[in-house]
Regions:
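Helix-loop boundary and gating motifs at the non-cytosolic
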Residues: 35-163, 339-343, 347-372
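Intracellular juxtamembrane helix-capping segments at the cytosolic ends
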Residues: 139, 227-240, 453-467
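Glycine-rich segments within core transmembrane alpha-helices of 12-TM secondary carriers
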Residues: 166, 249-268, 480-491
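Helix-to-loop junctions at the C-terminal end of transmembrane segments
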Residues: 170-184, 397-411
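A membrane-interface helix-boundary motif in multi-pass transporters
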Residues: 186, 271-292, 496-515
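C-terminal ends and interior cores of transmembrane alpha-helices
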Residues: 192-209, 421-435
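Multi-pass alpha-helical transporter architecture, strongest
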Residues: 206, 297-306, 509-526
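A late C-terminal transmembrane helix in Major Facilitator Superfamily
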Residues: 470-500
């Protein structure tokens, strides 16, 4: 026993002496003491870590579908929960991975899932409202004040340039945010910078009385908005687990749709003296208000969303020349893809042409609308409010019934073509002798319903035209060009019709023709 206790005390003294020894003496073996053969043996036994480079956001199907719905699709389509999911071979439902794990590798807790759903819905609402106000009301008012009789031509030119710039910026920002490595993550820095740029540009825009400056700062506004919308769409596809993506997508769509209505009503309410030169009740004041709203949108969205993890540790890969636009190449050996592409392009043209010139239509294209009243507003402001609310009600009703409508027909072309016919009937109503204000309200109601049905049931038809399920993300990126081309066609053709005839009502005839072409092309899909 005495010998054992002495041995134990000796070991304790040795351990204490080792712990108290200098750092240089605590490492008995260093690399210098190993032979080259020993180093090679250790290297063979060590586990070689080869971390995978994260998938590019412009190749993720969920990201592309989110962008399509955000830019020119119907946001309430996701609220219908149609069984037409975008195929994705990376989905956890196709293997034994936990569906609670997001594509970025994180596993959010239940409170974090609620924060993700609320954050993306709130971001969609708060960012959509100012942009809807600017696009539909404030920019047309500013151009009308500065251009006078040339306002339609100038607005068409600004719309064309803005659409092309947005396309280029989306391609650049998607690659730039994918290759951002910092403690704040890949998407958060872009959202912060985009919010600052957008709010600053709108604030400066409110003080511009020179048309070239208006064009410059409006384009800066679009750049800033692209810096927000593209990273938000990428974050939505990466951070929301597969199990909860449908619910989060539905609430994001509701937020975007409600933001469109709220933005238009707020804009016309704040500009009851739009043509005056002061600040009270003018376009200048409204722009300053929405510039502050953009700041609130950025701060609130980032605070509600769980903080994004650091991207500093991610494996880095250089940017290649083809990374920017290679995803826009259409799939080979898919003739039906081009038919579906053209159908969507003309459907977008039918809706975008009316949306661009809607303020001028309400102001000068419907005759005497001074008796129209809603929400304490009258005249053109009331007409804009009525159309916004009617379109929202029609879209919401269609979203609630879309599941039943889609399941009632084995051939998805039948409800899609029926929706095209209903849309054509809706846009013809303002051309009839009935009361113009009532006609545009009915148009907004029926057209909102028809477009949601068409957008929802045509998704399955469009996905069926894609030849390879392994490249759905790239195919959807190419398909998203239909939004760009459709917006260009709608802006240019409607501007030509107004300039030649001087009648704003002819934009409804253009819309009817475009949607009729979309219906015929949809009939060719199978």
């Amino acid at each position: 026993m005495q010998m054992g206790s002495r041995l134990q005390c000796s070991r304790s003294r040795c351990r204490a002496r080792y712990l108290c020894a200098p750092a240089s003496m605590t490492v008995p073996i260093t690399k210098k003491t190993l032979t080259e053969e020993a180093k090679a043996a250790l290297k063979r036994l060590a586990v070689q870590q080869n971390p995978r480079v994260p998938e590019a956001s412009n190749e993720r199907p969920e990201v592309q579908q989110t962008l399509i719905n955000t830019e020119s699709g119907s946001p309430l389509t996701a609220f219908a929960h149609l069984d037409a999911a975008v195929p994705n071979l990376e989905s956890s439902f196709l293997d034994l991975r936990d569906p609670m794990t997001a594509p970025d590798g994180t596993t959010p807790t239940k409170p974090q899932v609620h924060r993700l759903t609320a954050g993306f819905a709130l971001g969609a609402l708060l960012f959509t409202a100012p942009m809807a106000a600017l696009n539909s009301v404030l920019i047309p008012q500013t151009i009308s004040r500065l251009s006078g009789t040339d306002r339609v031509t100038d607005l068409a030119l600004l719309s064309v340039v803005g659409t092309l710039l947005t396309f280029l910026m989306n391609a650049w920002i998607s690659v730039g945010s994918d290759h951002s490595y910092c403690p704040l993550g890949r998407r958060t820095p872009w959202i912060i910078a985009g919010t600052v740029l957008t709010a600053t540009s709108v604030a400066i825009l409110s003080a511009c009385d020179f048309m070239p400056l208006v064009i410059v700062f409006w384009l800066f506004t679009l750049i800033g908005h692209a810096m927000v919308s593209m990273p938000l769409a990428a974050a939505f596809g990466e951070r929301v687990p597969d199990k909860f993506r449908d619910r989060a997508d539905a609430w994001r769509g509701v937020g975007q749709a409600f933001g469109q209505v709220l933005g238009i009503i707020a804009a016309v309410s704040l500009t009851w003296a739009a043509d005056d030169s002061g600040w009270d009740g003018t376009t200048r004041f409204a722009m300053m208000v929405f510039a502050l709203c953009l700041v609130v949108a950025g701060v609130a969205t980032l605070l509600v969303l769980p903080f994004e993890g650091s991207s500093s540790y991610l494996p880095r890969e250089g940017v290649k020349k083809g990374d920017y636009f290679s995803q826009y190449r259409p799939p080979k050996g898919a003739p039906k893809f081009f038919i579906a592409f053209a159908a969507r392009m003309f459907a977008i043209a039918a809706t975008s042409g009316i949306a661009i010139y809607q303020w001028y239509l309400a102001q000068d294209g419907l005759g005497d609308v001074s008796q129209v009243a809603m929400f304490g507003l009258s005249g053109a402001a009331a007409v804009m409010s009525v159309m916004a609310v009617a379109a929202f009600v029609g879209s919401l009703l269609a979203a609630l019934l879309l599941g039943r409508i889609a399941r009632a027909f084995k051939d998805s072309r039948i409800p899609a073509i029926a929706a095209c016919l209903l849309f054509v009937v809706a846009v013809v109503l303002p051309l009839t002798p009935i009361d113009r204000a009532m006609a545009v309200a009915l148009y907004a109601l029926f057209a909102g319903f028809a477009y949601v049905v068409y957008d929802g049931v045509s998704q399955g038809l469009n996905l069926a035209t894609l030849p390879d399920v392994r490249s759905v993300g790239r195919s959807l990126a190419a398909f998203s060009l239909a939004n760009t081309f459709g917006s260009l066609i709608g802006a240019v053709v409607c501007a030509i019709a107004i300039a030649v005839t001087g009648e704003y009502l002819l934009i409804f005839a253009v819309a009817a023709g475009c949607m009729a072409i979309a219906g015929v092309l949809t009939l060719l899909l199978k």
